[in-house]
Every structure is written in C-alpha cells, then in structure tokens.
Amino acid sequence: MALPTLPSNWHSRSRVLEQQIVRQREQEARLRHQWDQTNQYFKQSNVCSSKQAQWSSRQSYQKSMNAFHQEKQKEEKKKTLEYRREQLRKLLQEERDLLEEELKELRCNKEHNVSDMRQRTEELKSAREERQKQLAEELLYEQWKKNNVKLREVESSLFKKHVVDAWGEQITARNQEKEEEDMEKKRLENEYELARREAIERMKRDKEKRQQQEEELARVLKWQMEELKLKDLEAKKLKKEQEDLLRQQWEIEELEEERRKMEQCRKKTELSHFLSRQYNAQMKRRAQQVQEELEMDKKILSALISKEDEDQHLQSARREQAIADVAWMKHVIEEQLHLERQREAELDTLFREEAKQVWAKRETEWERERNARNRLMKEVLAGRQMQIQERIERNQLAQAESVMNRERLLRQLEEARQFTSREKKQEEEQKTARRTELEAQIAEQLLKGKEAIVQQEEEEKEFKLAEDLENDLLQQEAEIMTQRGYQKKTYSRPRTAWS
C-alpha cells in the first residue's frame, strides 16, 4: 500500500530551530552590511558635497571672474602697448626718412657757392639778434610782473583759487570713484541676487520634479506590495489546498485498505460458515455481512459526495458528472441494502432443503452483486484518485508560478528601493552643496565688506597724513622765507636760440 505524501512543514523541532538560528544570523549579517554601506555612503556624500560646494561657490565664481577680468585687462594693455610701439616705429621710420632726405640735401648743397653760405650766415645772425632782443623784452616784462605788488597779489589770489579748484577736483574725483565703487558693489549684489533667485527657482523645479517622481514611485510600490500580498495569500491557499488533497488521497487509500480487509474477513467467514452447514444462521450472518458491506460502501460514497461539494474550483461539467456517478452508486447500494433486509426477513419461514436451495441461489446472486459492486466502487475511487492527482499537479504548477511572480515582485521592490536611495542621496548632496555655497557667499560678502572698510580707513589715514605733511611743509617754508627776508633773484645767462 502506498503511504501518503507528507507536507513540507512536517519537520522535526530541531531542524526548525536550526533554520531560525541560521535566518537570524543571516539577518544580522545583512543588517551589519547595510549599516556599513550606509556609513560609507554618508562619508562619500560629505566629501562629494564639500568638493562640489567649493567648486560651485560664489567665491570660486568671483575668483574666476577676477582672473578673467585681469586676463582681459592684460590683453588690452598688451594691445595698447603694441599699438604704441607701432606708432613709435612709424615715427622713428619717418624721422629716419627725414634724416636721409636732409643728408641727401646736405650732400647736394655742399657744392653750392660761398655767397649763398654768407647770405645764410647773415640771415641767421639777424634772426639771432632779433630773438635775443625779443627774449630780453620778455625777461624785462617778467621782472616787472614779479616786482609789481598788485600783480603779485593777483597771482597769489589766482594760485589760491587754483589750489581750491585742485582740491575740489580731487574731492570730485574721489566722490566719483566712490560712486563707481558703489555702483560696482550694487551691480555685484544684483548679480548675486539674480543668481540666488535662479538657484531658488531651479531648486523649486527640482523639488517639484522629485515630489512627482516620489509620488509615482510610491504608487508603484503600493501596487507592488498589494500584488505581493495577494501572491502570498494565493501561495498559502494553494499550499493548504495541496495539503487537503494529500489528506483526501490518504483517506481514499485508507478506505480501499478497509475494503480489502473486509473482503478478507468475508472470505474467512464464508469458509467457516460453509463447514458448519447451518444454512439459516449462515444466510442470516451472510445477509448481515452484506448489509455491513453495503453500509460501508454507503459511508464511503457519502464521504466522496461531501468532498465533491467542498471542491468548488473544479470544472462544473466534470464535477456534476462525478457527483451524479457517486449519487447513482449510493442509490444502487441503498436498493441492495433494502433487498437484503427483505431477504433476511424471509429466512425464518424456510425449511432446511429450501434453505439449502435458497442458499445456493443467494450465494450466486451475492457473488454477482459483490463483483458488480466492487467493479463500480473501483471505478468511482479511480476517478476520484485521478481528479485528486490532476488537482495536485495544477496546484504545484500554480505554486511554482506564484513563487516566480513573488520573486519578480521582490526584485522590482529591491530596484525601487535602490532608486529611492539614489534619489535621496542626490537630494542630500544637492542640499549640502547649496548650503555650503550659501555659507561661502555669505563669508565672502562679509570679508569683502571688512576689506572695503579697512581700505577706506587706510585711504582716509593716508589722505589725512598727506594733508598734515603738506601743511607742515608750507608752514616750514613760510617760516624760512620770513627769516630770510627779501632776496634778489639772479638769473642765468639765456641760451642762444638757434633755428
């Protein structure tokens, strides 16, 4: 007799404990590995964000712009220098050409006559005397201007006015320079504000995009989790159904074993009754035995009918056919049971010879009915066994498909988790980079403000120091001139003017 197949969850307690310990250790190792990965990830994120913030900071941008402006100024100076050099080369070339022409003229004029040279000498002498006379008149005029008190007062007032105008021009230039610095500072602030607004808008768009992606991912994850739960429920249901089918198969095998045992008992009883030759009692016992067999077959068929009613997922046509076959077999057995009871009631009225004849006749009928009943029961049990085997195969296929779907969903969930982790990592890196950039910009602005204040204070100190030094020099010069008194000025001999 084939033993029933045990389900997969009937293991010993020691093996269950070993599996639990192994799973616990694997989970601890997985958690440690995940913690190490997370720690390494945050370290790398900090390094990347710091470098990215340093490279994308306002200070780095300002350095790049300053270097660009300096390079541009150098190029402009270089172009200006080249232009001036070119102009100087042109002037030198023109002078060389003029000198060459003069030398050529001199070579040509050497052969002129002496009279022309004397005439030229007289003309030069008269021109020199005229210039000397004019220079003497100019010197006398300058001496008269210096010796005239009114003219000196006018010159002093003009000098004071010139000094005041020069101071005003310096103040105006300083104010203009300060206005230019303020305008440059305002321009930089406007550029910084514009860049900050653009960064805020970009951050806002990125945040909205990430929110949409997260919402879409959350919907997908929720759908996958629900599908995974359904697959788990389906797997549990299929497993339970397989256990029920195995149990039914085992029960059918037990029923067949009981019928075989009853058949053996019947044969032994027939042998003993045949030897006793007590026909009436033997027929009664035989009738009771047949009734017991019929009752047993009736119970088996009732159990099969109840099992068929429980199997709701079978195909309707096959299920109705199986129920109809079992019900018909049950009806036949009930009719035979009723007939045997009537036969048992007729035994009391029979004599010995009649009982012997009836016994032979009944024995033939019983044998024929038993063979027919056994054949029908075998067909019913074989059909039931085939149905259970088909359902077990379908259940195994469904379980395999459920396992594949569950593995696929788990892979998708793992991919979604990794994608979410990468998105969070990028978001943290961007936040850190923006925060570092803002801090660097604030520090740069504060440093520029301090440098501007220090530079302004130094310029004011230098300006005040130069003013004090000039006042001291003027006071010393005035004291020296007062101590010396008036001194007559001497003039050197004027240079001879040659054309």
Swiss-Prot record:
Compartments in which it is found: Cytoplasm, Cytoskeleton; Cytoplasm, Cytoskeleton, Microtubule organizing center, Centrosome
Functional note: May act as a 'capping' or 'branching' protein for keratin filaments in the cell periphery. May regulate K8/K18 filament and desmosome organization mainly at the apical or peripheral regions of simple epithelial cells.
Gene Ontology biological process terms, A to Z: apoptotic process
Keyword entries, A-Z: Coiled coil, Cytoplasm, Cytoskeleton
Residues forming coiled coils: 17-143, 169-304, 405-485
GO cellular component: centrosome; cytoplasm; keratin filament
Pfam families listed in its UniProt record: TPH
Family: Belongs to the TCHP family.
Organism domain of life: Eukaryota
Protein name: Trichoplein keratin filament-binding protein
Region described as Trichohyalin/plectin homology domain: 260-426
InterPro entries reported for this sequence: CFAP53/TCHP, TPH_dom
